[in-house]
């Protein structure tokens, strides 16, 4: 079950992939997931996608400063540029502070 994320900063990355270089994309995505998890303030990630290459990835950070530091990380910036050049047809990003967080689970 999900943790309470009230007060955390959420970065919502909504994208559509080109379908180009799927292996390179998978390698880069795994590397970025691992690198993000090592960053100060990282709190977790959720990801959903469909067969058409559209996806939503939400990364959670302790605060906006942590999210900004991740955006500025040199390896992340390099991979972001590769994504613009090869892997994404488009993307949009939203940053928000979570005002309320709860979950439910069937038992």
Predicted regions and their residues:
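A common structural junction motif
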Residues: 77-80
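Short S/T/G/P-rich N-terminal loop/turn motif that feeds into the first structured element of a domain
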Residues: 1-55, 64-72, 88-107
């Amino acid at each position: 079950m999900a943790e309470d994320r009230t007060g955390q900063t959420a970065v919502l990355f909504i994208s559509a992939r080109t379908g180009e270089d799927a292996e390179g994309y998978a390698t880069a995505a795994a590397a970025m997931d691992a690198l993000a998890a090592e960053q100060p303030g990282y709190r977790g990630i959720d990801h959903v996608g469909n067969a058409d290459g559209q996806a939503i990835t939400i990364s959670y950070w302790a605060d906006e400063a942590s999210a900004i530091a991740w955006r500025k990380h040199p390896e992340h910036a390099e991979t972001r540029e590769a994504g613009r050049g090869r892997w994404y047809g488009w993307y949009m990003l939203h940053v928000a502070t979570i005002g309320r967080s709860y979950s439910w689970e069937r038992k």
